């Protein structure tokens, strides 16, 4: 199933502010009720599972696959998170192509944190990552950058989807996925090399230097072991 709709961000929607705040840092969209009617009329098999649609620029044909939050958008309109519109060069009120797709369950994903030092300060970063991704990003595409909002601290963590398997677009909801981490964008190799200092200076800074030097090991092996994590259960 394919159709064209007018695309607007959540900032242009009449939805309640709580819903807008929840969805703007996700890849979930709002579609018109008429589309659900068409799917029901056709007795589409996908209704038994989660629905995913590729939102594409009609001229460049570049797009991203999104999940559906509700069928509550006005007739002829799709509401899309602004960060997805921006990555696809889609402006407010632009015609977009909406195409029903069925990505396979993923079995591997490699992630790259933009700000690993802040993320690793969370009490349980692995649990936070799994919970937010399964809630807000049920499907991911290799090469995209996602924005994870952690409401308890009101922080947004940017994460690159470096690699996915078995295909470039995968569903992560209820999937047993091996998670690996690429070197974070804020990783500074110079910080992990202990400088040559006098014995007195080394004594004064031993604890701090040791902490920094072992940061990458802690980040890779203890905070984010990345083996067979089940991302999502809803």
Where are these regions (language model features)?
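Beta-strand/loop-dominated core regions that host nucleotide or nucleotide-derived cofactor-binding catalytic loops
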Residues: 1-234
